[in-house]
């Protein structure tokens, strides 16, 4: 089943702007548009601040019941999507299952760059209580590289006209100026940041400097022949980039089963724990350069991982890449076997010693590891003696196994839900049934034995 993508539109637009993308991405992704307050078919009763728009979106995602999802935000909707994503990753909004974010000419978390004269002109359009057809058409034409075809042009103009003037004004006066840039740290969710080549205030330079730095796993691209209204102007180009990003960067690695994901999203789990599990569940970047090891050493560690922690199915966790991150961040277990150098140096030496054996297939490597464990292997390279290599191999096996067990999908596979011992309330729910083979009503069904 395709992953659900919740789509948040631009100022003066609605979920209608994603119809073309929805058709083009059908079968890969299921796009679901959300009309933000005061736009499309949505009233402004829930409020028009960024916080209020974020809450509306979070509630819509929660009501949907989906447990694997992504966000797509265009212009104004990009700012909202960025806040929702950050509150999901830190666990504070009670959502779980975010896989990726796509931003189209997005308004940044910082105040949006906008020419003062243009802002004043746009405010003037709504001053008399409605945005007229001429003003709406002027807005659409000013935000496209060339005039849209008649049907999308008419829809885009209609969307501007039906925008509630108060919502339009509130964004220009307040929402676009709100500064959320210091509220959240860089977000590790895989992100695709797209800019229209002919956009003005939110063009390529603005996206590179204001949006991309917020995403530590972000990618950037420019869509030719487009200004600001990318989904209307270049739906094929935008869809192709999203599809490639999804297949190459996101659609791999295990997905947390729905019943476990719902427990993680529930009040039984603290925000801090939910945030940790959210980051652990993100897809790895298989083509990313290693941070602590060389590319050759990482390949050897991947071979070692296949032998030491064989994973079922065709969507494994990239354990080696996660251990590389662990080494780069200095997040070891605090123990070093007597006689071994620092963790990073020990890994480099141990992997260099096994490089030739790793190229001869997993079965051969498994036999070599057996000899190492028995203390019967004499390394010919890498700088470690037999005893040191034995100690390092044991340490590496522990690191790989820990990374595997830390993934929420693995926890589901081994029927572990001990993380759900109580949320952030004054009273922890805890567990009532502690006997063997006893399962509480809220617990996931568990893996088949």
How does the language model describe each region?
Residues 1-43:
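Conserved HGGG/HGGXW glycine-rich cap/lid loop of the alpha/beta-hydrolase fold
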Residues 8-10, 74, 195:
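The conserved beta1-alpha1 loop
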Residues 23, 190-226:
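Conserved loop-alpha-helix segment in the C-terminal half of the alpha/beta-hydrolase fold
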Residues 32-72, 76, 83-94, 223, ...:
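Active-site loop/oxyanion-hole signature of alpha/beta-hydrolase fold enzymes
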Residues 86-87, 93-130:
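Flexible "cap/lid" loop of the alpha/beta hydrolase fold
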Residues 112-116, 130-185:
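Conserved alpha/beta-hydrolase catalytic His-Asp/Glu region
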Residues 226-239:
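Catalytic histidine-centered segment of alpha/beta-hydrolase-like enzymes
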Residues 275-289, 301-393:
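Flexible, low-complexity segments enriched for small/polar residues
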């Amino acid at each position: 089943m395709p992953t659900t993508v919740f789509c948040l539109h631009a100022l003066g637009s609605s979920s209608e702007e994603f119809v073309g993308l929805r058709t083009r991405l059908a079968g890969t992704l299921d796009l679901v548009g959300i009309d933000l307050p005061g736009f499309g078919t949505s009233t402004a009763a829930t409020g028009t601040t960024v916080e209020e728009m974020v809450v509306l979106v979070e509630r819509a995602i929660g009501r949907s019941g989906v447990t694997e999802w992504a966000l797509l935000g265009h212009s104004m909707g990009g700012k909202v999507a960025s806040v929702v994503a950050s509150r999901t990753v830190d666990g504070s909004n009670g959502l779980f299952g975010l896989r990726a974010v796509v931003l189209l000419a997005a308004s940044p978390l910082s105040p949006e760059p906008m020419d003062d004269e243009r802002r004043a002109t746009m405010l003037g359009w709504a001053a008399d209580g409605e945005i007229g057809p001429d003003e709406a058409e002027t807005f659409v034409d000013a935000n496209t590289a060339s005039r849209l075809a008649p049907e999308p042009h008419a829809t885009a103009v209609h969307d501007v006209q039906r925008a509630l003037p108060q919502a339009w004004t509130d964004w220009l006066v307040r929402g676009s100026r709100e500064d959320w840039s210091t509220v959240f740290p860089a977000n590790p969710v895989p992100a695709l940041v797209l800019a229209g080549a002919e956009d003005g205030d939110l063009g390529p330079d603005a996206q590179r400097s204001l949006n991309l730095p917020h995403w530590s796993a972000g990618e950037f691209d420019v869509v030719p022949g487009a200004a600001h209204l990318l989904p209307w102007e270049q739906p094929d180009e935008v869809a192709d980039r999203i599809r490639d990003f999804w297949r190459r960067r996101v659609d791999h690695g295990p997905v947390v089963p729905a019943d476990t994901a719902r427990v993680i999203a529930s009040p039984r789990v603290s925000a801090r724990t939910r945030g940790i599990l959210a980051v652990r569940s993100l897809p790895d970047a298989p083509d990313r350069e290693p941070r602590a090891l060389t590319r050759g050493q990482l390949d050897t560690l991947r071979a070692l991982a296949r032998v030491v922690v064989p994973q079922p199915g065709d969507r494994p966790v990239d354990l080696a890449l996660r251990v590389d991150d662990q080494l780069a961040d200095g997040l070891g277990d605090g123990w070093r076997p007597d006689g071994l150098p620092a963790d990073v140096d020990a890994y480099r030496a141990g992997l260099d010693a096994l490089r030739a054996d790793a190229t001869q297939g997993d079965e051969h490597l498994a036999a070599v590891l057996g000899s190492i464990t028995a203390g019967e292997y004499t390394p010919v390279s890498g700088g470690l003696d037999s005893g040191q290599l034995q100690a390092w191999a044991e340490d590496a096996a522990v690191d790989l196994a820990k990374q595997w067990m830390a993934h929420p999908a693995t926890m589901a596979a081994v029927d572990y839900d001990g993380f759900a011992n109580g949320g952030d309330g004054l009273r922890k729910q805890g567990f009532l049934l502690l006997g063997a083979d006893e399962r509480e009503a809220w617990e996931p069904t568990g893996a088949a034995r």
